[in-house]
Amino acid sequence: MRYLIKGGIVVDPVADTLTCTDILVEEGMIKEIGQLSDSEAEVIAAEGNYVCPGFMDMHVHLREPGYEYKEDIVSGTRAAAMGGFTSVACMPNTNPVADNAAIISHVLAKARNAAARVFPIGALTKGSLGKELTEMADLKGAGAVALSDDGMPVMNADIMLRVMQYASMLEMTVISHCEDNKLSEGGQMHEGAVSAMLGLKGIPSLAEEIMVARDILLSEYTGCRLHLAHISTEGSVRLVRQAKERGVPVTAEATPHHFTLTEEAVQGYSTNAKVNPPLRRQTDVEAIKEGLRDGTIDVIATDHAPHAYHEKDVEFQYAPNGMIGLETAVGLIFTQLVQPGILTVPQAVAKLTCNPHRVLGLSGGRLLPGTPANITIIDPKLSEVVDPTKLLSKSKNTPFGRWKLTGLPVLTMKDGLLVMRDRQLLE
């Protein structure tokens, strides 16, 4: 199939440019970029819209295998495509844990015809128990693009040291969920005035920051590429900024909920606002925004964490952590970061394209002739009110219901195939 994307504002996140031009797509590849005409191609009118490299969410939980009642590869990638993502990287905290080549191969096989490209992340330790290293070379050989025990932090520094030494030899990125689970044990939300008022045990910022500091030092010692997942505190941003100034090979991500919501969202004991790391203070939100603005934080990722209704419809302390994010992330980025001028369009797009690709050691994230046609088109003027009942994810655990978002994806193309167009998924 031939498509001519006509008159759009093409975003180059590497060159940091916006150019009004056309893109010709043929046989799944970008054939040509320029002022074009092609009588045989189907024209996609893109005037006034941003034509971007296909967005990647490098931190999602697709829940397959083992928890398909929450989400599966089909439903999760459909949600991704609707949200403007052509690629996702899925975390290994499935059942069984993705700690061996067979599970990685299974995920890739199930994702072969999915609505978005799926890049599995393998576990650091067997069962994500933090005791015995996985066969990392086998995981890489099977297709794992990085290593993480996400949600189950490796508490033993000697184990984490050996993890980084082996990962460095394999040229793989270690993704760290930074939490000292002795300091956070029993915690339900951020430790502060709101937790005291609600009578909920708090999780101090220190629980995150002490592990950020440890893992940065281990990365500096081993030379291993370290990526810090969903940092949430002012102190963490400062530690990453200082480490980058020293030349440590560290990158970091932030989620839309951590640059949008504060601990106040938990008022009324809303379980959809219960996440880990928890929603923090306004000063932390501002620090995350500044980290995104100055480049300290490289990536925006959702930590899409679906849970069934019955799991969240319980007393606060019994509810699992997590919220969905694939279908609201882009709107939140444009509404909360681009429109107020915190990020330019190319800067925002970089955190969803070339930067996550670079972190994971993947090619892509830029629109160039001769590369696969993975494309996301954004209408910067289009607004919608979030209706959780209409989201494509199996789970509806979002705190953003009834939020009005402006700047939404109107087309996603995966390897030259239209997956979503005009806010409708194409079957």
Swiss-Prot record:
It catalyses: (S)-dihydroorotate + H2O = N-carbamoyl-L-aspartate + H(+). Substrate binds at residues 61-63, 93, 276, 307. Gene3D superfamilies: Metal-dependent hydrolases, Urease, subunit C, domain 1. Pathway: Pyrimidine metabolism; UMP biosynthesis via de novo pathway; (S)-dihydroorotate from bicarbonate: step 3/3. Signal peptide: none annotated. The active site is at residue 303. GO terms for molecular function: allantoinase activity; dihydroorotase activity; zinc ion binding. SUPFAM superfamilies: Composite domain of metallo-dependent hydrolases (SSF51338), Metallo-dependent hydrolases (SSF51556). CDD domains: DHOase_IIa (cd01317). Zn(2+) 2 binds at residues 150, 177, 230. Its EC number is 3.5.2.3. Keywords: Hydrolase, Metal-binding, Pyrimidine biosynthesis, Zinc. Zn(2+) 1 binds at residues 59, 61, 150, 303. Pfam families: Amidohydro_1. One of its GO terms (cellular component) is cytoplasm. Binds 2 Zn(2+) ions per subunit. Catalyzes the reversible cyclization of carbamoyl aspartate to dihydroorotate. Belongs to the metallo-dependent hydrolases superfamily. DHOase family. Class I DHOase subfamily. PANTHER family: ALLANTOINASE. This is Dihydroorotase. It comes from Desulforamulus reducens (strain ATCC BAA-1160 / DSM 100696 / MI-1) (Desulfotomaculum reducens). The gene is pyrC.
